[in-house]
Amino acid sequence: MSRALDPHTDFIPRHIGPTAADQEKMLAAIGCGSLDALLQEVVPPAIRSQGPLALPASRSESDVLADLKAVAGRNRIYRNYIGQGYYGTHTPNVVLRNVLENPAWYTAYTPYQPEISQGRLEALLNYQTMVADLTGLDISNASLLDEGTAAAEAMTLARRGSKSASQVFFVSAHCHPQTIEVVRTRAEGLGIEVALGDEAQGLPECFGVLLQYPHSLGGVADYRALAEAAHAQGAVVACATDLLALALMTPPGEWGADIAIGSSQRFGVPFGFGGPHAGFMACKDAYKRNMPGRLVGVSKDAQGNPALRLALQTREQHIRREKATSNICTAQVLLAVMAGLYAVWHGPDGIRRIATRVHRYTAILRAALTQLGIKVVNDTFFDTLLLETGVATPAIVEAAVCEHINLRRVDGARLAVSLDETVTAADLQALVNVFAAGLQKDDLALDIDAHDAAAPGGIPAALQRQGGILAHPVFSSIQSETDMLRYLRKLADKDLALDRSMIPLGSCTMKLNATAEMIPITWPEFALIHPYAPADQSAGYRELIERLSKALCEITGYDDISLQPNSGAQGEYAGLLAIRGYHRANGQAQRNVCLIPASAHGTNPASAQLAGMEVVVVASDANGNVDLDDLRAKLTQVGDRLAALMITYPSTHGVFEESITHICDLVHQAGGQVYLDGANMNAMVGVARPGKFGSDVSHLNLHKTFCIPHGGGGPGVGPVAVRSHLAPFLPGVLNAQGKLGGETGIGPVAAAPYGSAGILPISYAYIALMGADGLRRATEVAILNANYVAARLRDYYPVLYAGRNGRVAHECILDVRPLKDSSGISAEDIAKRLMDYGFHAPTMSFPVAGTLMVEPTESEGLAELERFIDAMIAIREEIAQVERGERDRDDNVLKNAPHTAQMLLAEEWLHDYPRQQAAYPVASLRDAKYWPPVARVDNAYGDRNLVCACLPVEAYA
């Protein structure tokens, strides 16, 4: 067939920024003849793959979308009344279109640079305010990964805050079953004993208690006396709860809970076969400095204006490392933003109306089922009824299946039904008809109004919420869609995301999130599948998971993989648990030491600690590589206690260490396993396969290498891939009842069987669109772009580390430490000045304090690279002006950066440089200028005066 008739597949050059001509120019500039020659210089021969990946060729966008549509069509959308922590919801269309589908929101990074993140920080502050208000507690964080992991985090927070010497954590049998299993997994690694029981029978001696309010199967209990009893023995009370129910029920903070956790999924976020959804945690003020996850706080900027920032960061894993009590890094920012905006959209009256409608429909259903002769076990309820259906259970289930209805199958003689905001009167009638058919009775025609008038409510008077909800004006100020649209635009305009400019963050891989990859995630066939629906309804998801798993195993060289971990840190944790389980199965439980290089990501030592391992740090040599002499000494020192070496490759210093295979051999000879952190996999896809050059296990960051967007701090997916001997110890997969089915090595690490399955189509689409050749080319160009930036900037800023032939991998570290002595200018000053040039800063002070790490990714074209390079060169000249004494050391464009419009329009200008230099340091900014909404934020003030809820409107006057 003529090539003119070949399908048009142009995705690869759309994803890869530099054109072929640009690549030639760049190669010439760095003194290299070809991309292949560059790889020969950069990648050690011992690890280089000898052949292409066994993956299909690149396909067109239309072909891949048609393929995914066919896969999605194999899922079967049923009416879901399963509940169990996952509920039907209506995503407001204005939020769907302008947030979830808007790259201004989904391509942003975690808001470490607050001056260019004020929009999403405000949206997250709304979320925190909403959660704290509804739970009746003092402070909320900005999201956790899901309800199950939030419960596990509550357990560790309780242990830190408890006055009890006990190692027992009591978990109510009324909790969601998947929550119980995730808590058990976490407890086992930490040496905590989980006592599962009915709290009505009394509490054992324990350091903490986890309750469910309302119960998983519907009941609503008054926990006041129980909370008092727990506190009397020094225990901390944690409560898993439902935000919608709390619109009508007494908040946990009022009846004695110290911590409240749960999922905000039903606030506008679809099922997605289990995720992603934003977990939440709120707590009393006394626990705030130990609370896990990001925390948005209010501070002020250099002009005295209110400004938001991430607060209390010194408690987090990237600071505390092995002393951290949580490994949370990426959370669920995009989903938390959606949930908070759901509350803004509906307002307090709307939320109460939704909750009341759900509750009244449940009361009507209870009355109708009682009329049919079904025993409803629980007299108290919000939205869930437990039914004794006895021998009629199979017939009722069959009748439901015939009507495409899912009920919760508790056991062979009981069913449960959970209602939600999507239920209509017609749905209620269909549900009643199903039970009548299963009982072989005539249909019962519902008179909704009559039943509503007669049916008693399910919330006891003593537990009915008194007073209003969502009192802050932000939840009452939006009246029309026009108002909402403009509010969302105002927030988005405050932020700098990939839709505006390159985000050169080292070790973060801020690459293109192509529109074609994003489209399938909102299709109903993917969005509306309940994670605990019968397996025959998720055939499409299972096929997608199988295909993606095989592709990732081929890319990495491993034998098996779990897609369950819903962040990179959770992938690390799961991988270390697999190693721990493997050693224990071999009768070597004493192997509990994890060696970690000093340059490792902060999540590495934090994850090792959570997995019950002792961390021993291995030094780096002068070239930034693992110090082999120190490694040998540490191997000798720990002896048969060695569990693993956890190493990032290419290293966090941005180089391919030549000795990696030798390092793996040394660890294996000592009886340990090699954990290779896959955070930098973007430098190896199609070029090297860690499972084939000595590693035993890796996690991948699908939100880095495989194009799931960062979402401003989540969602993420962190699959853990292993060689065959570790496969039996991958995370356990829960069955339809949310329990572990059969034998398994370890328990689950996430609440849903396949974690954040709803965003897996993104990575599948990326791999299919790129094909084997495109994936390799992406790696080649990522390495080219990094080396080009390093070569162009080397005369202005020393490049701290390089591999053989003076090359870097996919990122480079610019050493700006000498400038501190010569000019008083710090890495932070350069980072803030880059905002005036329209750029997000590189990674600051990691892995080396006082430096900047740059990762351009393959998606940035030559023009954008040159714009960044020009900015960095111009900034170096601005520093030189200070060094030469032409500008004041304390009053200069860097120390005062970023410059807001308010600063530049001030009537008096008292600075030692012209306004023009502050605003337009390069001519190109006159055509497209991003204005930071706030001046430099005062971090210390924010931590000294901690406020983590919305300020009164007057504060902004």
UniProtKB/Swiss-Prot annotation:
Keyword RNA-binding in annotation: no
Gene3D superfamilies (alphabetical): Aspartate Aminotransferase, domain 1 (3.90.1150.10), Type I PLP-dependent aspartate aminotransferase-like (Major domain) (3.40.640.10)
GO biological process, any: glycine decarboxylation via glycine cleavage system
Keywords assigned by UniProt, alphabetized: Oxidoreductase, Pyridoxal phosphate
GO cellular component: cytosol; glycine cleavage complex
Presence of the UniProt keyword Oxidoreductase in the record: yes
Entry-linked Pfam families: GcvP2_C, GDC-P
EC class: oxidoreductase
Cofactor(s) this protein cannot do without: pyridoxal 5'-phosphate
Modified residues (N6-(pyridoxal phosphate)lysine): K704
GO MF term set: glycine binding; glycine dehydrogenase (decarboxylating) activity; pyridoxal phosphate binding
Catalytic reaction annotation: N(6)-[(R)-lipoyl]-L-lysyl-[glycine-cleavage complex H protein] + glycine + H(+) = N(6)-[(R)-S(8)-aminomethyldihydrolipoyl]-L-lysyl-[glycine-cleavage complex H protein] + CO2
Catalytic activity, EC: 1.4.4.2
InterPro entries for the chain: GcvP, GDC-P_C, GDC-P_N, GDC_P, PyrdxlP-dep_Trfase, PyrdxlP-dep_Trfase_major, PyrdxlP-dep_Trfase_small
Reported function: The glycine cleavage system catalyzes the degradation of glycine. The P protein binds the alpha-amino group of glycine through its pyridoxal phosphate cofactor; CO(2) is released and the remaining methylamine moiety is then transferred to the lipoamide cofactor of the H protein.
PANTHER family: GLYCINE DEHYDROGENASE (DECARBOXYLATING), MITOCHONDRIAL, GLYCINE DEHYDROGENASE, DECARBOXYLATING
Assembly with partners or alone: The glycine cleavage system is composed of four proteins: P, T, L and H.
Family: Belongs to the GcvP family.
Name of this protein: Glycine dehydrogenase (decarboxylating)
